[in-house]
Each structure stands twice: as C-alpha cells, then as structure tokens.
C-alpha cells in the first residue's frame, strides 16, 4: 500500500505533468515496468493464498464464501447480519452530483453494489464496518464434526444485499464487488535539478511528521 500511495502515485503525477507541458518523459516506460512487476507480485500472492487455503483445510479449518453456505449456515448468516452488521452500515447511492472520493477513507475496504434493472444500472457503495466487527467471522460448529468454518465479513454483506436494498429500489439483479481505497500520499515533492535526493527525501519525511 505504501508503494502505491507514494512511488506509484508520484510516477502517475509525473506523466500528467509531462502531458500538460507537452514534453517527453521516461515515466510512462517506468509505469509500465511497475505495473508488470505488480502483476507478478499478485500472481505470487495468489499462489501463496491457495497454498494457505490448502494447509488450513488439512488442519480442518475452512474459509468459505457466500456461495458455499449450507441452509443452516445461511440462516445463521442472515440473523448475524440483521443483528450485528446492519446497524453499522449505511449504503451511499452513487450519483453524478456526489463526489464519492470525499466519502472514501484511506485503507478502508468497501463493497460496490451494481443494481441492475433491465439494461440500466445504478450503483451504491458500502463501507465494510471493520471498526466495529471482525473481518473474519467464525460460523457455528456442527455437532459431531471437528472442523472450523470461517467466512469474511465482506461475503456476509454480499449474501445479504437483498436485506439492504429490497423495498427501497427496484432491480432484477444485484452484485457486490470488494474494493479497497488507497489514497495518493500527495507529498508535493519538487524535482528541480538543484534538489539532491537526500533533500527530496528529507522534505517528504517532514511532510509525513
């Protein structure tokens, strides 16, 4: 996250400044290399995540999503949502006259909701209330089975989207997608020739204190 907040954001700013001034810049090439590296890191993360899930399963710990719940778990999740989750969430309807960025908090996770009616879509934003609730929720154990089942709070909300929107909006289908907000650190570092690297770093650190 720190990399995207500072270095990645800085390179993108350089590109925008270069475009405004009509000059050439190596930043586009650098950005491409950074994106390629980020994709490789994501692939490594996916591999490690898959291995972690397999190791958890060997220890009889299972991470499930909303599509893997049985009927008993569905009923429990719905009750948990109504009692514990719903009081802490307020969907934000996304409209053209609303500056969504002013509502997004840095380092917070959200679910974007697509409410579809015919060929039209309306969008809403839900902050995942991790300030009030655990991100990982343990489902009740089944009698006679020595296994632990865990579900993400995100998936509980996705499963219960109808609980939030039914009766307030007309829709044929709705889908939720997880996202996380990582803001540009906006260090305002100056890159004049006379500034040494040490001076630039010192200025950046001072802005963070």
Q: What does each model-identified segment do?
A:
Residues 1-209:
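N-terminal non-catalytic structural scaffold regions of very large proteins
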